[in-house]
UniProtKB/Swiss-Prot annotation:
Broad class of the protein's primary localization: cytoplasm
Catalysed reaction, written as an equation: apo-[ACP] + CoA = holo-[ACP] + adenosine 3',5'-bisphosphate + H(+)
Keyword Lipid metabolism assigned: yes
Organism: Vibrio campbellii (strain ATCC BAA-1116)
The protein's name: Holo-[acyl-carrier-protein] synthase
Assigned protein family: Belongs to the P-Pant transferase superfamily. AcpS family.
A biological process from GO: fatty acid biosynthetic process
Leading EC class: transferase
Gene: acpS
Keywords, sorted A to Z: Cytoplasm, Fatty acid biosynthesis, Fatty acid metabolism, Lipid biosynthesis, Lipid metabolism, Magnesium, Metal-binding, Transferase
Necessary cofactors: Mg(2+)
Residues binding Mg(2+), per UniProt: 9, 58
Amino acid sequence: MAILGLGTDIAEIERIEKALGRTGEPFAKRILSEDEVIKFAELKQKGRYLAKRFAVKEAASKALGTGIAKGVTFHDFTVSNDEFGKPILTLSGVAKQIAESMGVNHVHLSISDERHYAVATVIFES
């Protein structure tokens, strides 16, 4: 197995919370997939959740080498968790097509947050 792509992103939670406060749910829906929007609606710390998902999607788009451009959108990435809480990143749409063309067979995701920041790292592996 070889590393085909690596991306890291850090998001300031307060900045995301302010944007969410200004624009509300439309801002969240611009970033989150349908499954993530359902979970988002149930949470108390919405800004923290959104900041972590934003960081993941930016990191994943960097690992693809495209950023959020060239047909790749935030909705092409969905974060869920396995039965142990491990984060799982699922690709769809153009992001999935690009990853397949790169030969990606394994996706690794790490997410962490502290008081002020959320950070994510994504590795695409053959």
